[in-house]
Amino acid sequence: MPKITKIEVQKKNKERFNLFLDEQFEMGIDIDTLVKFNLKKGQQLEAADMAEIQKYDHYRIGLNKAIQYLSYKKRTEKEVIQYLQKEEISEQAISEVIEYCYREKLIDHQDYAESLKNTMIRTTDKGPKIYQQKLYQLGIEPNIIEMFTELYREQQELDDIIQIAEKISKTKKGPQNKVKEKVMQSLIQKGFEMETIHAVLNEMDFTQDEAVLDDLLQRDLEKIYNKNRKKYTQQKLISKTIEGLMRKGYKYDKIKAKLEESGIADGTEEIE
């Protein structure tokens, strides 16, 4: 039966020990393993004893890795499991580590959801759908997702969302209805819900300076006209130009007036 002939502190990690059986290095163990099994020089170990020691120390390695991983920031169960799998910790040990983390409140999904909610509302321009999606991707339970997404909706101030929308609006140029449409699409992409978006849009003023709009119309007209002038006959070209400008949100009467002002049309042309 193998006998412990030496136990020495590792040089690079004072919390771990080298275990020697019959003068041969057998394995490294941590101090908790040493204490749990009351290991000491001269002690004889059966194969079953060694299997238990190895199993427990593997768990301890996984636990220490998890604790260190959790020390940097809050994590979910899914994140910890994925991390330990990459660290080649066994599924059995991972299961025991997760149980320990829940028991000691190192993993707490409600606390995680609360913290993420507060951070996102305070520091991002994202709505509840993005928050909800993040929780889902992180493996949070559906009932917690539902509860905290509702809190997100309640706690995100409408005035703050209006400010987000106005910031978007300042980067968009063009006819009022088109700018409004672009703002709406941006808010959808940021995770806001349609009921909230409509409430925000109703509070905003999308009126733009007529001179600015006139310049934009002239610019877009020239761009579309010049792009297609070699492809179509004059009548078809005018029709395509009108269609293109209407898709950009310009009103038909404004387009016709600008075409006549530019000398491109004489006022008799219609869209084909």
From Swiss-Prot:
Tell me a GO cellular component: cytoplasm
Q: Answer whether the UniProt record assigns the keyword Cytoplasm to this protein.
A: yes
Does the keyword Thylakoid feature in the UniProt annotation?
no
The UniProt entry's GO biological process terms, in alphabetical order, are: regulation of DNA repair
Which key words tag this protein in UniProt?
Cytoplasm
Q: Where in the cell is it found?
A: Cytoplasm
| Domain of life (superkingdom) | Bacteria
Family per UniProt?
Belongs to the RecX family.
Job description of the protein: Modulates RecA activity.
Its protein name is: Regulatory protein RecX
